[in-house]
From Swiss-Prot:
The chain crosses the membrane at residues 400-417. GO terms for cellular component: MHC class I peptide loading complex. Glycans are attached at residue 78. Gene3D superfamilies: Immunoglobulins (2.60.40.10). It comes from Gallus gallus. It is a single-pass type I membrane protein. This is Tapasin. PANTHER family: TAPASIN. Its main location: endoplasmic reticulum.
């Protein structure tokens, strides 16, 4: 087996993602409004373009919930879904799904690892009739189904799901270096299959992993990419999740999980966003300045991703009050360009040169404030300016001393009556 691939045959791997138990089927999901494209697609869930017509997908009969408001459908598809892959679309809280439907010609892949599915280079006899690809999704769930059509009345088409590829993680966020699972599974009649995981980013694409179930081998496996292969469960669903051991900024982008069967193939798409919060250091750590001299503050922001970061300076005069812009006490400031490290993260430095120190500047607090998309709130690192040769308590020191004195006074008053009470009682008895 190719290096870098671990096949984890975990029958329970899919249990956290599986659809409702077939013994107690849930009510059918609400009908889904769809855009029916006129052009014939290229197969596998790729739209073929052309004009769009309003259509409606119905699942398993009449649903209790009416469809979302919209134009009157010109075509209604009554879809039979034996594996329940479309059921999660109606589970509350329900987000109106997006849906695109286009006719297609069933076909297998042209990659070398998918050719053994059709050694005679001919489509199977079951590939006759009309075929469509339905791509339906919400922020929490995405499914692409290959539909085989049957007879129907005017304006109505009866279709059955022949293959469905789904994901419970259509959009993911991963920290640099932290393992991440890109969930994918498929439902289909028992047969040999070929799996392909492809990564696309900034116009470039690569096959991360390919797996052939007939040989249980991976003809293609990129280092760091692992296949979590689940066994077929009672609902006919097989998990084919991709695990990235140490994602880096270069792993950000679009991931395509494609499943090839003898009668055709389809795929689902996932988006991975990589992030890393910045580390912030401020120098010097101790800011002691002689009267009449200036100092320079440097704020170093490192190890962050993505690129955009904002660095600002703030000052609290005398260490009290609210933070304000230090423009009255800063002569000059500058910010370096971005520098990229070997792991793909970025760093940059901001500096501020202060005006010559005066007695009234003693105790000023300067802060470097960093804002970044990976931070829940801005990060602040501060330093206090101390004027050499200047003594005397600051407001914070006075407040602290007052609190200590208050506590000590209360403690003495609590202890003193206990010690003095016997003497007072003796005097009264005399």
């Amino acid at each position: 087996m190719a290096a870098g691939l671990r096949l984890l045959l975990a029958g329970l791997c899919w249990s956290q993602f599986r659809v409702e138990d077939a013994a107690s089927p849930p009510p059918p999901p609400a009908p889904v409004r769809c855009a029916l494209l006129e052009g014939v697609g290229r197969g596998g869930g790729l739209p073929g373009g052309g004009n769009a017509r309003p259509a409606l997908l119905r699942f398993g009969g009449d649903a209790e919930t009416p469809p979302e408001p919209g134009p009157e459908p010109e075509v209604t598809f009554n879809v039979s879904d034996p594996w329940g892959t479309l059921t999660p679309l109606g589970v509350p809280p329900r987000t109106p799904p997006s849906c695109e439907l286009n006719p297609t010609n069933p076909q297998t892949g042209s990659d070398p690892w998918s050719r053994p599915l059709h050694p005679d280079a001919r489509s199977p006899p079951t590939a006759g009739g009309q075929w469509w690809v339905a791509a339906v999704g919400t922020p929490q769930y995405g499914v692409t189904a290959l539909l085989q059509g049957g007879m129907g009345t005017e304006g109505t088409i009866t279709a059955a799901v022949a293959l469905a590829v789904l994901t419970h993680t259509p959009t993911l966020r991963a920290r640099v270096g932290s393992p991440i699972h890109l969930h994918c599974a498929f439902a289909a009649p028992p047969s040999s299959f070929v799996l392909e995981w492809r990564h696309q980013n900034r116009g470039a694409g690569r096959v991360l992993l390919a797996y052939d179930s007939s040989t249980a081998r991976a003809p293609r496996a990129h280092p760091g990419a692992e296949l979590l292969l689940g066994t077929r469960d009672g609902d006919g669903v097989t998990a084919v999740t991709l695990r990235l051991a140490r994602p880096s900024p270069g792993d950000e982008g679009t991931y395509i999980c494609s499943v090839f069967l003898p009668h055709g193939h389809t795929q689902t798409v996932l988006q991975l966003h990589v992030f890393e919060p910045p580390k912030v250091t401020l120098s010097p750590k101790n800011l002691v300045v002689a009267p009449g001299t200036s100092a320079e503050l440097r704020c170093h922001v490192s190890g962050f991703y993505p690129l955009d970061v904002t660095v600002t300076w703030q000052r609290r005069a005398g260490g009290s009050g609210t933070s304000q812009s230090p423009r009255d006490t800063v002569m000059d400031s500058w910010t370096s360009g971005h520098r990229q490290a070997a792991d793909g993260t970025y760093s940059r430095t901001a500096a501020a040169r202060l005006i010559p120190a005066r007695p009234q500047h003693h105790g000023d607090i300067y802060s470097c404030v960093v804002t970044h998309t990976a931070l829940a709130k801005p990060m602040r690192v501060s330093v206090r300016l101390l004027l050499a040769g200047t003594e005397g308590p600051h407001l914070e020191d006075i407040t602290g001393l007052f609190l200590v004195a208050f506590v000590l006074c209360g403690l003495i008053r609590w202890l003193y009556p206990k010690a003095a009470r016997p003497k007072e009682e003796t005097k009264k008895s005399q």
